[in-house]
Curated annotation (Swiss-Prot):
Its EC number is 4.1.1.112. GO terms for molecular function: magnesium ion binding; methylisocitrate lyase activity; oxaloacetate decarboxylase activity. Belongs to the isocitrate lyase family. Oxaloacetate decarboxylase subfamily. This is Oxaloacetate decarboxylase. CDD domains: ICL_PEPM. Substrate binds at residues 50, 159, 235. Catalyzes the decarboxylation of oxaloacetate into pyruvate. Seems to play a role in maintaining cellular concentrations of bicarbonate and pyruvate. GO terms for biological process: oxaloacetate metabolic process; propionate catabolic process, 2-methylcitrate cycle; pyruvate biosynthetic process. It comes from the Bacteria.
């Protein structure tokens, strides 16, 4: 299998963003899954922050994974990847200066693009887990990310949560990040096409949506017409791998267990112990849901 340079994969991703089509990402979480995704013809993969936390820490998505741990996993994928892949870089692991370090490390790891979100992470004492940083801080992070990259083909995508703010505020944020120079805008929490149309109306950069399979947004042609080029429907491949591992090991031990009929998502919940983290956050941090 011929090797493809990281810069070439980044150009491929930019070419994808320039087309009038919308594609769905493959969830890639290790070198094998990246090779499988490329062999099956996926145009782009994504290393999700939540999936990396599960893979590295067996922990839920509470911003517990460190930059070095995330970069190590991205590097393993980048070493063999035959398709461009996006790194979900969460909040950039700190302030704007931390964002610069994040970009430097992930660029060396071989990612084609990375998302930097404006969620207030990690969760702060006495704050809601969905709180966002100010627009000004978000702009600073976008500008810092652009300054830090060496390869101009690396795409910097600004991410925000469209589900926790009034539509007018979402429009203000996305336009601000576009003006700051982001190569694309990623959104989670878009409710339906009417919501998307309102936000996308004045945006000219390519859009990326995290839909988690929302049936109200299940129309690739319509998404493409509104500027959406990449959709993350979820990380089904990873959860299927967890379920397959459980089923195989259970069969090997010839056991019947109370968790036998649980779905992949339920199994993940069982073994990551999220109730512990929720309780600790409430006890030690007074985090509001």
């Amino acid at each position: 299998m011929p090797k493809i340079s990281h810069s070439a994969l980044r150009r491929t991703f930019r070419e994808l963003l320039a087309t009038p089509t919308c594609v769905e990402t493959a969830s890639v979480f290790d070198p094998m899954s990246a090779r499988i995704a490329a062999d099956l013809g996926f145009e782009v993969g994504i290393l999700g922050g939540s999936v990396a936390s599960l893979q590295v820490l067996a922990a839920p998505d509470f911003a517990l994974i460190t930059l070095s741990e995330f970069v190590e996993q991205a590097t393993r994928i980048g070493r063999v990847a035959q398709l461009p892949f996006i790194a979900d870089a969460d909040h950039g692991y700190g302030n704007a200066l931390n964002v610069m370090r994040t970009v430097e490390e992930l660029e060396r790891a071989g990612v084609a693009a990375l998302t930097i979100e404006d969620t207030l992470l990690p969760a702060q004492f006495g704050r809601k887990s969905t709180d966002l940083i100010s627009i000004e801080e978000g702009i600073g992070k976008v500008r810092a990310a652009l300054e830090a990259r060496v390869d101009p083909e690396l795409s910097i995508i600004a991410r925000t949560n469209a589900g926790v703010l009034p539509t007018e505020a979402v429009i203000e944020r996305t336009l601000a990040y576009q003006k700051a120079g982001a190569d694309g805008i990623c959104m989670v929490g878009v409710a339906d096409f009417e919501h998307l149309e309102q936000i996308a109306e004045n945006l000219t950069v390519p859009l990326m949506l995290v839909t988690y399979g929302n049936p109200k947004l299940n129309d690739a042609k319509r998404l493409a017409s509104l500027g959406v080029r990449v959709v993350v429907a979820g990380h089904g491949a990873y959860f299927a791998a967890i379920k397959a591992t459980y089923d195989s090991l259970r069969a090997q031990r010839q056991l019947t267990h109370s968790t036998d009929n649980l779905s992949a998502t339920e199994l993940t919940h069982t073994y990551t112990l999220p109730e512990n983290y929720v309780a600790w956050a409430e006890e030690f941090m007074d985090v509001k849901e």
